[in-house]
């Protein structure tokens, strides 16, 4: 059985990795996310009754950041530039109909446009 401090350190590291993946090249947001993560972990330094819930919350937050956050960017010099999404390998893909299909592999037939 793992101790809460080891689990907390692991959750913190996973959260930092997830912020690095989700906010790559957006240093302002990356710094803000990491600062908030640090603040939350510092507020709950001592082991308490809700420590396992806090660790689970951190792991779930890391999962959401890694699988559901997509950042867009466009060329700031061009006023009519199109937004480009930075979709990485961990992003959960699907369409609205696929949400209703539980536990099945979803085949994407066409690319997003």
From Swiss-Prot:
This is Mitochondrial zinc maintenance protein 1, mitochondrial. It comes from the Eukaryota. GO terms for molecular function: protein folding chaperone. Its main location: mitochondrion. Disulfide bonds: none annotated. Assembly factor required for Rieske Fe-S protein RIP1 incorporation into the cytochrome b-c1 (CIII) complex. Functions as a chaperone, binding to this subunit within the mitochondrial matrix and stabilizing it prior to its translocation and insertion into the late CIII dimeric intermediate within the mitochondrial inner membrane. Modulates the mitochondrial matrix zinc pool. GO terms for cellular component: mitochondrial matrix. It is found in: Mitochondrion matrix. Interacts with RIP1. One of its GO terms (biological process) is mitochondrial respiratory chain complex III assembly. InterPro entries: Complex1_LYR_dom, Complex1_LYR_LYRM7, MZM1/LYRM7. Keywords: Chaperone, Mitochondrion, Transit peptide. It comes from Talaromyces stipitatus (strain ATCC 10500 / CBS 375.48 / QM 6759 / NRRL 1006) (Penicillium stipitatum). Belongs to the complex I LYR family. MZM1 subfamily. The gene is MZM1.
């Amino acid at each position: 059985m793992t101790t809460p401090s080891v689990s907390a350190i692991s959750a913190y590291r996973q959260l930092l990795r997830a912020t690095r993946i989700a906010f790559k090249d957006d240093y302002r947001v990356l710094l803000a996310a990491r600062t908030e993560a640090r603040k939350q972990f510092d507020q709950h330094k001592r082991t308490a009754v809700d420590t396992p819930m806090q660790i689970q919350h951190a792991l779930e937050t890391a999962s959401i950041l890694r699988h559901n956050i997509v950042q867009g960017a466009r060329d700031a010099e061009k006023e009519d530039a199109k937004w480009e999404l930075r979709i990485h390998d961990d992003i959960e893909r699907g369409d609205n109909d696929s949400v209703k299909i539980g536990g099945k592999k979803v085949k994407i037939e066409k690319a997003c446009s």
